[in-house]
Amino acid sequence: MLTDMDISRRAHLKDIAALGAEFGLLPDEMQLFGKTKAKVDLRAQQRLAEQQQGKLIIVTAVTPTPHGEGKTVTTIGLTQSLKALGNKVCACIRQPSMGPVFGVKGGAAGGGYAQVVPMQELNLHLTGDIHAVSSAHNLGAAAIASRLYHETRLGKAEFESQSGQNYLDIAPNGIRWHRVVDHNDRCLREIEVGLGENNGPAYTSGFDITAASELMAILALSRNLADMRARIGKLVLAVNRQGAAISAEDLGVAGAMTAIMADAVKPTLMQTLNGAPCLIHAGPFANIAHGNSSVIADDIALKLADFVVTEGGFGSDMGFEKFCNIKARQSGLAPSAAVLVTTLKALKANSGLTSDADINAPDQARLEAGFANLNWHINNVARYGIPVVVAINRFATDTDAELNWLIEAVAGTAAFGCELSEAFSQGEAGALTLAQTVMRACEQPSEFTLLYPDEMALEAKLSTLAEVGYGATGVSLSEAAKLQLQELSALGYADLPVCMAKTPLSISHDPQLKGVPQGFIVPVRELVLNAGAGFITALVGNVMTMPGLGLVPGYLKVDIGADGEITGLG
């Protein structure tokens, strides 16, 4: 079989302007970037505001493993098969961060014959949205550091006299806003800034990866440009000596930060291998942020398509949970059905049983033990009140006996249905049965339900998420988190939803606990207010907001020839 890159290069692409017109966009609603991608102007969203909505399908997965479950492959494959069945369909996915592209995970365009193309353009830069987020974020960091420098240098009276601005009285070490970069770089997690003469008061800070920026979450959750501007104004950049928050609006930088992101608020239109439209927009990680593509992209797609297929990052305890309790809560766009991706290899890896055998080799004991993880995720999705279809992403090494056993086992669960998917090797022909089952699932009566109401106390939300969302026996708060809980509740932020920042490699907080962990307590070390994004992040265990590169990073495979052809992506 050809490599992902070769398949992408040999694809016969539609001119993006023609594809956009077929999709229902007007010429002046597309800002073309060559013939392969285009920004979608928000005038399209305004024009389509009263259109009837299509069906929204959310793709999730079992607990991820190093072998890859094929969630994006299934998302794109399902989209292609829905199109092949005569439906008007659109995929909505996140823009890949270059951190994972050059780290371990690789690209995020799908794979095989279920790809968004050209894949190298998607995986590297695209239309520059992540760079815009980085630049806007770092302007905020430069602005608050500069304000601290000038206020310290001049004092209150002289500062207000010379600048015509209010004295913010920023507390020493009161700056909360880190800088960001779109790479994995662990040495930047903790730094000292402002060192040296005339460089401002020194303070401890750090870098996060851009995908973890609150600005990225704002981009993904905003309903329109005005909403994004209002949310950016609420960003908490620092605190003053009295402990009160200093916002981007207080600093006077919110307008400029939004201006940098004026084009980033527009989704990017690309296409799948069989010419189905795909909107790529925003890229928050699901372990350290809320892990879903944008509300704006979903809104536009739902007004133009019969079916919209999107995905949440990692397993159903991560991106899917946050899709429901954060994204759908804020947007009001509820899914009609969910697709839960699994593989034989994933179940064996999640069995908790050690074995020297090849993960591809038949192993009924490990398969049966790992099935508990799949069943947990089925029940987890079902508790939100929507039908769930299990998609078994088939690999060439899978045996019919194990596949048949798994299909029969799923029949005894709460799943609406279970189908094999061979989209990777067969493209649109490989997921037709899956598409038909998903279409039937979308017609089922359902009542989308959130895990907790807005008015629930913040501590109760944490407990509910841990106990019901993960199966824990409870939560434990560090002393710092206890104080933060009191402060956030006193300031009136208790009605916000919770975004758990935890490992994706286990349903629990501990990546070593496989299968369906029991009897564990979720340790919350810190609570962080994201006033602009509209949620509170609970940092759990040892999760980091700046990843590091591994021993054998992905960039080792990437190169470019004299002809300009890039190799090693995917």
Swiss-Prot record:
Enzyme Commission number(s): 6.3.4.3
Keywords, in A-Z order: ATP-binding, Ligase, Nucleotide-binding, One-carbon metabolism
Any one Gene Ontology molecular-function term assigned to this protein's record: ATP binding
One biological process term in Gene Ontology: tetrahydrofolate interconversion
Presence of keyword ATP-binding: yes
Pfam families: FTHFS
Domain of life: Bacteria
Protein name as annotated: Formate--tetrahydrofolate ligase
Family: Belongs to the formate--tetrahydrofolate ligase family.
Biological or metabolic pathway of the protein: One-carbon metabolism; tetrahydrofolate interconversion
Catalytic reactions of this protein: (6S)-5,6,7,8-tetrahydrofolate + formate + ATP = (6R)-10-formyltetrahydrofolate + ADP + phosphate
Residues the entry annotates as binding ATP: T65, P66, H67, G68, E69, G70, K71, T72
PROSITE patterns the UniProt entry points to: FTHFS_1 (PS00721)
InterPro entries reported in the protein's UniProt record: Formate_THF_ligase (IPR000559), Formate_THF_ligase_CS (IPR020628), P-loop_NTPase (IPR027417)
